[in-house]
């Protein structure tokens, strides 16, 4: 089983327009959809589609409209009650392919709810092969929340394997605390890998796009040296790199028509973890990771 912790989930609304978006004018939507979002939720959805057991832990009131959206995708849930509603992230798409995103403000999650999220994750982890901690953090949650959560999980379930996918300040806090709170796997993109090691992530990505992966491998090895067994770097069309202290593997997707990149990295993570849970080799796990992300 795979357990996901998503501290800052979202209702992802997509509005499709037949015409170009013009600020200050009235538009009629061609279509509108609402789905459950958030990095951990996306991982849980992918695991569910693979017919594998999982539990998604997240904050939400019982009557929050986000909850039935998660139930609609058949994900088993464990919620921690909060007072404020889950945020809505809105994407406006035009026929030209241009998109405009408006991300909502996350709810307030107080200290009591923060501890309950960690407790719920620890309890679910007793029967799990992996725990995934993923996404941004909502209001009221300190940037070192994942550090605290990893330490707590190591105490309650010392043999559990932990995967982390975050960015910005939470990633910087992890980087500062790897000696005491290292996850087993970190799944950054190029920019986030740069945040981890204090390098220019954009330069790492650009080099990889040109076929030079040496910088990404060297940066990932710095993370390995601090106790992270697996660094799974997703690089878009350039594929994905899996780096350990003893080896590095590259997998590239076949040419495909990109419909949407939303959740691609989360699906890649799900594919890798499912393969590992099934006892596949690292090379096979990376291959499945890229297949899921495509």
Region locations from a protein language model:
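Positively charged, low-complexity intrinsically disordered leader regions
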Residues: 1-23
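Short beta-strands and strand-loop turn motifs
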Residues: 101-103, 130-136, 188-190
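Short beta-strand scaffold segments in enzyme catalytic cores
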Residues: 45, 88-92, 239-243
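Substrate-binding N-lobe of the ribokinase-like
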Residues: 27-87
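Conserved phosphate-binding/catalytic loop of the ribokinase/pfkB sugar-kinase fold
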Residues: 91-127
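Conserved post-catalytic alpha-helical subdomain immediately downstream of the catalytic base
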Residues: 221-222, 226-237, 245-294
């Amino acid at each position: 089983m795979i357990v996901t912790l998503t501290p800052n989930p979202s209702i992802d609304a997509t509005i499709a327009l037949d015409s170009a978006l013009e600020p200050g004018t009235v538009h009629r939507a061609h279509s509108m959809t609402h789905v459950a979002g958030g990095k951990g939720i996306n991982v849980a959805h992918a695991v569910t589609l693979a017919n594998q057991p999982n539990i998604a832990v997240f904050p939400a009131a019982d009557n929050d409209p986000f909850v039935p959206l998660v139930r609609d995708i058949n994900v088993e849930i464990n919620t921690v009650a909060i007072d404020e509603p889950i945020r809505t992230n809105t994407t406006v798409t035009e026929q030209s392919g241009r998109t405009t995103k408006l991300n909502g403000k996350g709810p307030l999650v107080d200290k009591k709810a923060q501890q309950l999220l960690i407790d719920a994750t620890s309890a679910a982890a007793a029967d799990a092969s992996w725990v995934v901690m993923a996404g941004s953090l909502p209001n009221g949650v300190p940037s070192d929340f994942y550090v605290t959560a990893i330490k707590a999980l190591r105490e309650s379930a010392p043999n559990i394997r932990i995967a982390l996918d975050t960015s910005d300040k939470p990633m910087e806090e992890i980087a500062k605390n790897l000696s005491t709170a290292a996850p087993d796997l970190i799944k950054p993109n190029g920019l986030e890998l740069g945040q981890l090691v204090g390098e220019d992530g954009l330069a790492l990505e650009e080099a990889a796009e040109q076929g030079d992966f040496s910088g990404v491998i060297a940066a990932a090895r710095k993370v390995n040296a601090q106790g992270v067994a697996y660094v799974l770097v997703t690089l878009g069309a350039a594929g994905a790199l899996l780096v350990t202290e003893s080896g590095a593997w590259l997998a590239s997707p076949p040419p495909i028509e990109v419909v949407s990149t939303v959740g691609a990295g989360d699906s890649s993570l799900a594919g890798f973890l499912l393969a590992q849970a099934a006892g596949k080799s690292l090379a096979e796990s990376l291959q499945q990771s890229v297949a899921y992300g495509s």
